[in-house]
Amino acid sequence: FSADMQTPKHEQSMTTDKVIDIDSLHLRYYGDNFLRHSDSGLWELFVKGDAFQRGEAIGKLSSDLLHYQEKVFVDQIREIVPSDSYLKFLRFFIVLFNRNLGENVLEEYRDEIYGISLSCTHEYDFIGTPYERQLNYHSAHDLGHAMQDYMLVGCSSFATWGTQSADSSLLIGRNFDFYVGDAFAENKQVAFYVPEQGYRFASVGWPGMIGVLSGMNETGLTVTINAAKSAVPTGSATPIS
């Protein structure tokens, strides 16, 4: 049994651009895009172009980070569910649950995820193709609702303004409680996007995550995703992030 993830048909760009790694500055370049490991310990990503171009650049710049994030994610799932037979059942359940996921994800997002997947490892192809895995990982937050007893999901946030903040300006904070082990949280990333269409925006997450869990666009519009207990879903839909 397999699912239709509506894999995009793009071919890898024939560009002559190569990743330029400047170790002394903890900086990587790929065309007009870059990834930097700042003194704060955060990864700072800057990408521009259409969806596929952005995804391809993300993959080229962070292939090692993508492999690390996937490894620790899969390792954590194996720790939570140590039984191989149950893992096989869980994989079947996810394939069945997400069988229509592709049609619920906009083409722009699928293109970006596909671009990223071209630089992903084949070590976990027993789960699915790199594209299928990356698309499913983007629904993990939603699937966490169906696994509430494992405490995979639960976020908190606050906002204050006026007399309640030091200078009367709006102050927003959040705690992202999507816990998949300490190792998964090691590589925190702030991504700056310059899309061909739409507003520029910044997003806080981890390597490979294209959704906005905490972010702000150039007009000042701010979004944070906060999960709450809800009814168990019966099928796939557009991931909330």
Model-derived regions: residue spans:
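N-terminal mature-domain region immediately after signal-peptide cleavage
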Residues: F1-S241
